[in-house]
Amino acid sequence: MITYFFLIVAILLEVAGTMLLPVTSSFSKPIPTIIMVLCYLGALFLLTVVVKTLPIAVVYATWSGLGVFSVAILGYFIFGQGLPWPVILGLFLIVSGVVLVNSFVEPKI
């Protein structure tokens, strides 16, 4: 169960780093840039821990799928980016796929 906790934290760090990309103003603002880099490094470090227990295909599908979903939702609320119905349908399919992929995985102990 700790493996999934690490995976969730890795996703949150990746999403935080991605949401900081526009704030860095093409890396011209040092503080947001440093925080963004630390978020990405933390996410990648945790992914290396998680793949010791879960198959990499499942880890990457979950990380990227939930990351895309989260960034799209946050982009809507924070940056006012649109979410037309085809995008909403696509996000629903991504989350459904993540749930399906994780339903049949057995962690290595």
Q: Can you annotate each of these PLM segments?
A:
Residues 1-109:
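Polytopic alpha-helical membrane proteins, predominantly small-molecule transporters/carriers
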